[in-house]
Each structure stands twice: as C-alpha cells, then as structure tokens.
Amino acid sequence: MAFTFAAFCYMLTLVLCASLIFFVIWHIIAFDELRTDFKNPIDQGNPARARERLKNIERICCLLRKLVVPEYSIHGLFCLMFLCAAEWVTLGLNIPLLFYHLWRYFHRPADGSEVMYDAVSIMNADILNYCQKESWCKLAFYLLSFFYYLYSMVYTLVSF
C-alpha cells in the first residue's frame, strides 16, 4: 500500500466532487423554485406581489451566479491535477465537461460582468428548461465521477 501523488489527487477530488454534487443539487432546487414561481398564477395582478417575485428571482439568480466560477474552477483543478499525475483515462473523462465549461464561460452575455443566469432571461421557459436539463446532466456526471474516483483511489492505493 503506497501513498502516491495520484492517490492524493483522487482523495482531494473525492472531497471536491462531493462539493460539486451539492452545488448542482442547489442549482436543481433553485431552478425548480424558479419554475414553480413562474407558473404560480396567484396574485398576478398585485403589484406588491410582482415586486416580491422579481426580488426573489433576482436573489436566486445572484446566488446561482456566485456558484458558477467556483464550480468551473474546481473542475479545472481536477483536470490539472490529473494531468500532473499522468492519469490519462481520468483526464480524458473530464476533458469534455471542461471544454463545455470553457465554452459556456466564454460565451456568456457580453453586456456586462454577469457570467450567466440573468433574472430576465432565466424566466424564459426554454432557457429555464435548458438550465435544468444541464444541471441534471451535471449531477449524473458528478455522481458517476465520484464513484469512479473512489474506485480509482482504492485501486491506486492497493496496487503499489
């Protein structure tokens, strides 16, 4: 049983992957909250309720934006660690999501410093559906990755 840099990478990745799973679960809950608030017909004509709904939507979008850069950074750190540890299969499994994160980050709205999740555009049903599907796909990826990292960590520790 040997403790190598690859084993350390897998251990750190397990902890960080658990945090990414919680980030994505929070995204799913937030999008469901937005969808429910969007479809709620109660008090549609009440201006006070409309202001309250808008403030709630802006608050949720602000919290969503705060999780984007940490999620992308943590996943980039995964890829960098696996590159340094020469874990090519694991790096190959993570590269597609890394490229998607880079594409998504560099194709953010050009009108400001907002990464994404604008309060006005997120209430478009198509964008909301897309964001929710994206979150479910990321949850599946991170869950499968978590168990792959767990297996790889044990294999790396036992094989030497």
UniProtKB/Swiss-Prot annotation:
Lineage: superkingdom: Eukaryota
One GO cellular component term: dendritic spine
Residues annotated as transmembrane: 11-31, 73-93, 139-159
Location in the cell: Endoplasmic reticulum membrane; Postsynaptic cell membrane; Cell projection, Dendrite; Cell projection, Dendritic spine
Tissue: Brain. Expressed in the neocortex, hippocampal formation, and cerebellum (at protein level).
Matching InterPro entries: Cornichon, Cornichon_conserved
Pfam family, one: Cornichon
UniProtKB keywords: Cell membrane, Cell projection, Endoplasmic reticulum, Membrane, Postsynaptic cell membrane, Synapse, Transmembrane, Transmembrane helix
Similarity-based family: Belongs to the cornichon family.
Assembly and binders: Acts as an auxiliary subunit for AMPA-selective glutamate receptors (AMPARs). Found in a complex with GRIA1, GRIA2, GRIA3, GRIA4, CNIH3, CACNG2, CACNG3, CACNG4, CACNG5, CACNG7 and CACNG8 Interacts with CACGN8. Interacts with GRIA1. Found in a complex with GRIA1, GRIA2, GRIA3, GRIA4, DLG4 and CACNG8.
Function comment: Regulates the trafficking and gating properties of AMPA-selective glutamate receptors (AMPARs). Promotes their targeting to the cell membrane and synapses and modulates their gating properties by regulating their rates of activation, deactivation and desensitization. Blocks CACNG8-mediated resensitization of AMPA receptors.
Name under which the protein is recorded: Protein cornichon homolog 2
The species this protein was found in: Rattus norvegicus
Gene coding for it: Cnih2
